[in-house]
Amino acid sequence: MTSSDSHRSAPSPEHGTASTIEILPVAGLPEFRPGDDLSAALAAAAPWLRDGDVVVVTSKVVSKCEGRLVPAPEDTRGRNELRRKLINDETIRVLARKGRTLIIENGLGLVQAAAGVDGSNVGRGELALLPVNPDASAAVLRIGLRAMLGVNVAVVITDTMGRAWRNGQTDVAIGAAGLAVLHNYSGAVDRYGNELVVTEIAVADEVAAATDLVKGKLTAMPVAVVRGLSPTDDGSTAQHLLRNGPDDLFWLGTTEALELGRQQAQLLRRSVRQFSDEPIAAELIETAVAEALTAPAPHHTRPVRFVWLQTPAVRTRLLDRMADKWRLDLASDALPADAIAQRVARGQILYDAPEVIIPFMVPDGAHAYPDAARASAEHTMFIVAVGAAVQALLVALAVRGLGSCWIGSTIFADDLVRAELELPADWEPLGAIAIGYAHEPTDLREPVRVADLLLRK
């Protein structure tokens, strides 16, 4: 058992006290400088500390004592330039920006404006960085107070930051030792018999915010003590308050999330060959088709028609006839029966997919030319336009969470497809698109290395 283990207490079923809590200022503290002994200064200023008190310290004081002050020019321009450099140095990733304001994640995992780089309550020739490890700083301060005063206290180190959804800033815990930073009510039942399913209270943040009412910002009162809370030490730290990575539903600001979505839209599309049975809302496909039809087309024409095979019997009959034709074609190539069966089986995806759409090129509005060369070029131009619309449809489906796979089979049976679907003779089928929710989650595609695929002249 470690020394810290011996001071841990059993968890309480309730984080609130239902009784009086006091918040006491710690007066008489000096102006701290690098190398100062914070524990000794607090012990001298607050010899009245008791077991169970929570000592709440503004992070700026800790930064000063730990030498996290950076010399800065006193002129506004130079000071601001250094501040921007320090913010960049402390930044792990940018979540959002508005004007010159940056909301970032720093090396501690904290998400806040300006990475915690601060020019308040320090000399004009300095800027302050956050403590390197606020949880460790809290633990050291707790041990120091125990050694000097013989008391078992909890310690919370705070910083000021804004909140999503709400105006204004509040103090939160960025370092903690000696108290349960979270209190989970999951499974508890209120007096009406309702189970509290997801309620988890950020106790350390509540303590931090409460003491700011005493500490303030201009009072030169960087430390306050909460008395009457009787905290439970479960070994947790302020790091347990951070929600990072996939658990964070607000990982980016709105503008940045939209930008990332635009950048990733193309990479979301990949060929999905196994689908779940989940039904697809018709509006999703209709909206995706509407977007796909904005693809570029020659002469302001509409050279694309999408035929949605919604009637099961129509789809099955068409696919059966295409499979028969495919077998005959392969047999005429003298392929063995097992090879033919294997090739034909690739078309099973069009039977199994929840939805199938066939894209057609229609030559409405195509220019007529007397020579074969220009007529062929005009035809190619219309084919390319359909290809653009097909790709646009696949991407539009992907951004709605729908998987798809383009299959070229109808191109090899154009007359048969037109006859089965009773379509005009100049409509050219250009494959088929299987659509559905992917059976397994899919990742973003990796961009292809350009290398010799992009030529420069």
From Swiss-Prot:
PANTHER family: COENZYME F420:L-GLUTAMATE LIGASE, PTHR47917. The gene is fbiB. Its cofactor is Mg(2+); Mn(2+); K(+). The keyword RNA-binding does not apply. Residues 1-253 are annotated as: Coenzyme F420:L-glutamate ligase. InterPro entries: F420-0_g-glutamyl_ligase, F420-0_gamma-glut_ligase-dom, F420_FbiB_C, FbiB, Nitroreductase, Nitroreductase-like. Coiled coil: none annotated. GO terms for molecular function: coenzyme F420-0:L-glutamate ligase activity; coenzyme F420-1:gamma-L-glutamate ligase activity; GTP binding; metal ion binding; oxidoreductase activity, acting on the CH-CH group of donors, with a flavin as acceptor. This is Bifunctional F420 biosynthesis protein FbiB. Its EC number is 6.3.2.31, 6.3.2.34, 1.3.8.17. It comes from Mycobacterium leprae (strain TN). Residues 254-457 are annotated as: Dehydro-coenzyme F420-0 reductase. It catalyses: oxidized coenzyme F420-0 + GTP + L-glutamate = oxidized coenzyme F420-1 + GDP + phosphate + H(+); oxidized coenzyme F420-1 + GTP + L-glutamate = oxidized coenzyme F420-2 + GDP + phosphate + H(+); oxidized coenzyme F420-(gamma-L-Glu)(n) + GTP + L-glutamate = oxidized coenzyme F420-(gamma-L-Glu)(n+1) + GDP + phosphate + H(+); oxidized coenzyme F420-0 + FMN + H(+) = dehydro coenzyme F420-0 + FMNH2. SUPFAM superfamilies: CofE-like, FMN-dependent nitroreductase-like.
